[in-house]
């Protein structure tokens, strides 16, 4: 795989959301969702944003991605702002396109990365399904295709919003291991949203926990596990208890 496109490894991401409010609709009053959320992300780190359902995790990710501009604050992605990829909860594959075509569509015609698509499809375990349409794939296979499409772009920033939700445990575990393999071979800055604390420990180098209600950063913790320990259930549970002991 070719190196990242001009990655400035010395430039962190700066996030400041002073206020994010959902406007009043009908009988529903305006709702303050995020307040004074501020943090910095080092390049090529894997930061997990966690917290209870409905606390604003996905909203925060949408703001960082530039999909939601109705907020008070500032997002500074530095030179990486033009090299950002978002992997959503749903795989978002075009039903009329094959696995290969769904991956290729994110690249311009003639892009040299197009030559790497077959190898990427093989790496995510879909070599025999390259010409299959999404309806013929299991949800786990569709999410493998989504990972391939995200990493073929060689992004400098990768945002992931609960991409392994609704999967059985063996499938989710397999996909988490695949994600780590891809990330280690192609380092990039990852912001990963999940409500699953065990998943947060297995993946993150750092965890940001949002508080419920008018969410702010309630906890900022470093995960002290090596790669082997992340695959050890006992080690993950011990680290999970250490980090989340007071919550």
Which sequence ranges carry the predicted segments?
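Conserved ABC ATPase signature
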Residues: 133-137, 141
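A short, proline-enriched helix->beta-strand linker immediately N-terminal to the Walker B motif
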Residues: 152-156
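Hydrophobic anchor residue at the start of the ABC signature
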Residues: 147-148
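Helix-to-loop junction immediately C-terminal to a conserved catalytic motif
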Residues: 65
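Catalytic Walker B motif of ABC-type/P-loop ATPase nucleotide-binding domains
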Residues: 158-162
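Conserved ABC ATPase "signature" region
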Residues: 112-129, 180-181
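The feature captures the beta-strand-to-loop junction immediately N-terminal to the Walker
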Residues: 50-52
């Amino acid at each position: 795989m070719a190196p990242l496109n001009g990655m400035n490894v010395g430039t962190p991401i700066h996030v400041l959301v002073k206020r994010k409010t959902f406007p009043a609709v009908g009988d529903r009053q305006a709702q303050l969702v995020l307040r004074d959320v501020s943090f910095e992300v080092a390049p090529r780190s894997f930061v997990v944003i966690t917290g209870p359902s409905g606390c604003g995790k996905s909203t925060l990710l949408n703001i960082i991605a530039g999909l939601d501009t109705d907020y008070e604050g500032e997002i500074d992605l530095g030179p990486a702002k033009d090299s950002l990829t978002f992997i959503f909860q749903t795989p978002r594959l075009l039903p009329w396109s094959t696995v290969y075509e769904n991956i290729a569509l994110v690249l311009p015609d003639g892009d040299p990365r197009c030559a790497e698509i077959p190898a990427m499809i093989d790496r995510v375990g879909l070599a025999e399904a390259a010409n299959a349409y999404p309806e013929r794939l299991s949800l786990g296979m569709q999410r493998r295709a989504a990972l391939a499409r995200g990493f073929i772009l060689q992004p400098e920033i990768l945002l992931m919003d609960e991409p392994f939700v609704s999967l059985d445990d063996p499938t989710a575990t397999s996909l988490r291991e695949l994600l780590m393999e891809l990330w280690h071979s192609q380092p990039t800055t990852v912001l990963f949203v999940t409500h699953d604390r065990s998943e947060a420990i297995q993946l993150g180098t750092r965890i940001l926990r949002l508080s419920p209600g008018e969410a702010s950063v309630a906890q900022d913790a470093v995960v002290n596990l090596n790669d082997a320990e992340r695959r050890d259930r006992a080690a993950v549970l011990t680290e999970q208890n250490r980090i989340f002991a007071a919550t």
